[in-house]
Each structure stands twice: as C-alpha cells, then as structure tokens.
Amino acid sequence: MVGPYSLSYRGGEMSELLTTVDGRPLKEALANAERSKRIRAVLLVLPLFVFIFFSFLYPIALMLYRSVENPLIAEHMVETVAILENWDVKEVPSEEAFAALANDLVAARKTREIGKIATRLNFETPGLRSVITGTGRKAARWGPPFKEQFIAYRSEWGELETWATLKRLSPTITTVNYLAAVDRKLNVEGNVVQIDENYQIYVDLFMRTAWMSILVTLACVILGFPIAYMLASLPLRQSNMLMILVLLPFWTSLLVRTTSWIVLLQTQGVLNDLMVWVGIINDAQRIQLIFNAQGTVIAMTQILLPFMVLPLYSVMKTIPPSYLRAAESLGAHRFLAFWRVYVPNTLPGVGAGCLLVFILAIGYYITPALVGGQDGQMISNMIAFHMQKSLNWGLAAALGGLLLLGVVLLYWVYNKLVGIDRLQMG
C-alpha cells in the first residue's frame, strides 16, 4: 500500500484500487457514509411523518372505515342474524326467527344495548326505534309461540320491510350509508331504489354546495385578479403596505368576520339603512341579504378572497413588465397585449387560487351555519348535524367520504387538463 490507495493486478492487467486509511475499499466507505446521511435525514423528518399520519392520514382512514362498518347488529343479535342468512325475503320468517329475535331482544335489554340497536335500525327505516324498544320490554314476558304475539303487539313485525331491514344490516361491512348519502336504499328484494321523495335531501345539498362553491370561486377571481395586479404593479413599499390589508382578515377571528356581515346585511342593518337614506328603496322594500344563499356567497367570498389574491400576486410578480411593453411596441393595443400576453402567464396562479378557494368552499361549515339560514346550508352543515345531533356517524362519514372523493376527482381533472406541474402557490 502506498498512502491511501494500493495497486493490484487482475487478469494480467494492473488496476488501481482506492482504499481508506484503515484499508477498506473507498466505494464501500462512501456507501456507508451515504447510508448514514440518509438515516439521519429520515430521523429528522420522522416527527413530521408521525404528525401527518396521526393528524391527517389516520383520521381520513378512520372516517372511511366508519362509513362502511356495521358491527352492532351482528354482535348483539347473533341468533337472528344466523336465521336470516337463509331467509328468502319472499314471506315473513318462520316461528324460529321470531323466537331468535325474542332471545336477542331480551339479552340486548339486559346488557343495555337495545337502545343502540333501535337507533341503528331507525336510521335505516324510520319508526323502528319504538318498535324495537317496545318489543324488547314485552318479549321478556312472552313464551312460545312468539310469531302471533309479535305481530299482535306491533303490525310492523308482519311486514317484509322490517325483516329486510334486519337482514340488510346484518353484515359487519355495508354500503347502506353511501346509498343513503345519495338518496338511495335497498328495497325488500335487494335492489337499489330511490328513497321517499320527502326524504331526498342529500343530492340537492351536494348540488347546492357545488354551485355555491363555484359562485364563490368566480367572485374571488373577479375581485382578486385586479387586486393582485395592482399589488404586483405598484412599487414594493406601497404594495407591502396594501398587502397588510389583504392579510388583515387572517389576523381577525373567523367568528367576528362572519357576524359582522350579519350586522351589515340584515334588513335593519347598515346597508339597508344606507339604501333607504339615499332613496334607492323605501322602508317597506328593505332587502333580505342575510340568512339565505346570497348571504352565504357574500360572506364566503370575503373570507376566501385572500386565498385567491396571494397565489395570483406571487405569480404576477414573476412576469416581467417588458412583456407588455414589447407587445405594445409591436403594434398591439394595450388591452390586447394584456389579454394575449399577460393573462396567459397568470394562469398557473389563477388555477392555484381557484383550486384552493373551491376546495375550501365546499367544506366550509361555520359561515353557512351562521349566515346561511335554510337556503344557504351546505353539505358540511348536514355532516355536522349527523355528528352532533342525530349521532348517525356512519352517514356523516359517508357524506364526508363523497366530499373527499369530489376533491380527489377535481384534483385529477385539473391535472389532466392543466397539469399539476403548472400549479404555483408562490
């Protein structure tokens, strides 16, 4: 060995083998060093991965699982589920099924699970809660034969729909929540049909949510583009001062910003008082601008406007002013130069802003809840209702899953039409 490397002969030819001071091949030493660097890099970002997993990936996975899980009936009505596996759904089950149901209801009442069972069945077929709880109290005093006593007590036990509901909810994994989320259900024969017209609300809510989110996005583009253009065109000192006004809403509570619109837009509010004072309308013609869809769109536009301005501004700052001057020097009208040269260069910012605003808008909850009234409610409000009041978490998770699917599809369409590589936030 001479110094840090040695010479060796292989196949009759002399080759130079580089080694470290301690005699290890240099290639192996470099590989070990690179491996150590990669391990240290992974350890540095490991807390971030853990945070993303527990705060983002795990909750989404849990929500999706909650939307299809259905263990309650299978766990607490074991005998009934076993009998109904072979039921042909053409006629009311035999005495054996009624006896199994009586045993399961008595056992569920002793374990205090009958209320949960009744609530779950009532979600699927309204009215079954009272049937289950009432029958559970009576069944403990009944003896064979059970079939006549069940039907005599509540006629629902003689209907195929009641037993079909029990059979539909027997599997531990089910899609009934997703069917309910699109106003569908399984009938007695197991076919997918529309639910009663009086209960069809979710498809309309999804359509309203999409339409209002599109309106908010368009309003943000129309208002945000001139603001971003002005900020990008002004000298740095002045644009920084005006940027504070754009960022000011982020420093104000969302609740304060939303309730301020109630003060401004209500029938006895500032805007109506001003129009009456100017003479645009008289006192009897005051306009209802809040607690409806219009109020929701106005309030959400103001709240989400910064999310449109900031991506536009960051892209516009990178467009050289010489582009417009060059187009005008070649004979183009100022507006034509702006439209044909400047605007196409801002499309990455427009796409980023639209994507961001639309995704935020379809999932907004507090603003529609405060200013939406009945006409301005969105699908997020119905998700909150099922989470907090009706406690139908499976349906709430299914509605959230469909909303997530819509966002993923929107992202996919944007990638196909525009290209996600052109998405610029700054």
Stretches with model-predicted labels:
Residues L43-L44, I201-M212, V276-F307, C354:
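Loop-to-helix entry region at the N-terminal start of transmembrane alpha-helices
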Residues P47-V50, Q302, F307-Y313, P320, ...:
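Transmembrane alpha-helices
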Residues Y313-L324, E328, A397-G426:
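C-terminal transmembrane helix and the adjacent membrane-cytosol boundary/short C-terminal tail
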Residues K37, H76-E79, I83, A369, ...:
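Interhelical loop and adjacent transmembrane-helix boundary motif
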Residues Y199-M230, V343:
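Transmembrane alpha-helix signature in integral membrane proteins
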Residues K27-E34, R257-T301, V371-Q374:
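Membrane-interfacial helix termini and adjacent extracytoplasmic/periplasmic loops
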Residues M1-L43, L62, R66-V203:
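Membrane-topology segments of multi-pass transport proteins
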Residues K27-A29, A33, L62, L215-L247, ...:
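Transmembrane-helix boundary motif in ABC transporter permease subunits
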